[in-house]
Amino acid sequence: MANINLDAFDKIIALDFGSQYNQLITRRLRDFGIYSELLSHKLTADEIKEINPKGIIFSGGPNSVYDPNAFKVDPEIFKLGIPILGICYGMQLMSYDLGGKVEKADNSEYGRADIEVLDDEAVLLKGLPKKQYVWMSHGDLVTQAPAGFEVTATSKNCPIASIADNDRKFYGVQFHPEVRNSEYGLDILRRFAFDVCGAKANWTMDDFIDMQIDEIRKEVGDKKVILGLSGGVDSSVTAVLIHKAIGDQLTCIFVDHGLLRKNEADQVMDALSRDLGVNIIKVDAADRFLGKLEGVTDPEQKRKIIGKEFIEVFNEEAKKIKDADFLAQGTLYTDVIESGTDTAQTIKSHHNVGGLPKKLGFKLIEPLRKLFKDETRELGEKLGIPHELVWRQPFPGPGLGIRVIGEITPEKLEIVRESDAILREEIKKAGLDEEIWQYFTVLPGIRSVGVMGDGRTYDYAVAIRAVTSIDGMTADFAKIPWDILQKISVRIVNEVDHVNRILYDVTSKPPSTIEYE
């Protein structure tokens, strides 16, 4: 599977107990230059010893430690001599297992809270302000710290907000230092990682590239690899990385289903094939896809048709490539976490490659499976992929097919494609393109009366969707300046045929999703 050998890097592992913030723990540590993975809480002490981490973090979670079905940890872990930091549920679990008391709180704490540092010399809190705000999310609390622990911070509703056992290097915080809403949370994590664990910041993207290229060469040998290229960031970076490792032994199949953004297919071919030398077979299948989608209005049915047709087209082309033993995919670490931990729900398969390895008998190569999205973008730039391609907007697998509400027709696709291009152009001109997390146009499927010149019109409305977010889990609508919105509106109505009204979506996520379908 072209998995990188991580023995060369200092590691801090996080055990997953189900917190919505658990991915942030590993993200923060990697930002410090320390390699980190989120692993199952079911790992045994022997398995952890084999990993040889510099430190262990117990994540937060939704359970109560005194519940018989609560997530537990191998008690032998506490005997390994490895520093441990418990966060929220993790602090409660460590306290409970080591003889402390955990009870239901009289007043739960969710959101911002103020804590007071009780010990100015506490390892994780030394030199930080005595009063600071943090992010709490708990309904239980530690009411008695275990023997050997000192209480180092308190809050109004949580008398034991932080604990420390310096002899065993066990620490706990009831709040979430991994969340940016905790004022000095990153400082606390840094102190645990560097001062307590003694980890070195030796996780670099250059090392990752060299080691991953070596791993790919060893695994593939003289065999051939095929890759389903969507034109998105993940598959593009995967393609260039594998190409650097094995050259023309890689063949990418780029299925243009006619649902891409304006000029997107040409941009991908120019950047990857012409400029970087990646071997790409481009299949123009727009008529085929649109024929299958004719008359279909249900969004889930549209997704299934697009996914099924993609697999069939890919399958037809893949069979033409002789001696191909491997299929490459742009799986990221977030996908691995979401589908592979005991506490997570299974995610949907990617529409264009789900089932292909089994269907065609390929071995799987996933060279990005250890990377987060931002690391993938960094890797892409180091590999020489153009900045605008690496930092392009998130785009759904079914493409514009789910930005046309109702039946998809060539006319409707053209309206969305052209209006979206105008929106992206004006947002970039205004310098907002890296400030707004995602922005696009949608054809909601409604028509309205309008007046153009001296005549009455009955044409389509176009909706603009623009959101700010960190990770896409939650989002707020972007406050685009009115003059910019006006310019976008005027251009779309004047330059795109059959449009006489522009709508601006001012809904957050939740209750809405970012995409309409």
From Swiss-Prot:
Gene3D superfamilies according to UniProt: 3.30.300.10, 3.40.50.880, HUPs
EC id: 6.3.5.2
Protein's pathway: Purine metabolism; GMP biosynthesis; GMP from XMP (L-Gln route): step 1/1
GO molecular function (one): ATP binding
Alphabetic keyword roster: ATP-binding, Glutamine amidotransferase, GMP biosynthesis, Ligase, Nucleotide-binding, Purine biosynthesis
UniProt KW Nucleotide-binding keyword: yes
UniProt: ATP binding residues: 230-236
Annotated ranges, domain GMPS ATP-PPase: 203-392
Domain of life (superkingdom): Bacteria
GO cellular component, one term: cytosol
PROSITE patterns, sorted: GATASE_TYPE_1, GMPS_ATP_PPASE
SUPFAM superfamilies assigned to the protein according to its UniProt record, in alphabetical order: Adenine nucleotide alpha hydrolases-like, Class I glutamine amidotransferase-like, GMP synthetase C-terminal dimerisation domain
Membrane spanning stretches: none
Class of this enzyme: ligase
Active-site residues (renumbered): 88 (nucleophile), 176, 178
Boundaries of every Glutamine amidotransferase type-1 domain copy: 11-202
Nucleotide-binding among keywords: yes
Reactions listed under catalytic activity: XMP + L-glutamine + ATP + H2O = GMP + L-glutamate + AMP + diphosphate + 2 H(+)
HAMAP family (UniProt xref): GMP_synthase (MF_00344)
NCBIfam families: guaA_Cterm (TIGR00884), guaA_Nterm (TIGR00888), PRK00074.1 (NF000848)
Subunit note: Homodimer.
Database matches in PANTHER family: GMP SYNTHASE [GLUTAMINE-HYDROLYZING], GMP SYNTHASE-RELATED
Function: Catalyzes the synthesis of GMP from XMP.
Record's protein name: GMP synthase [glutamine-hydrolyzing]
Gene name of the record: guaA
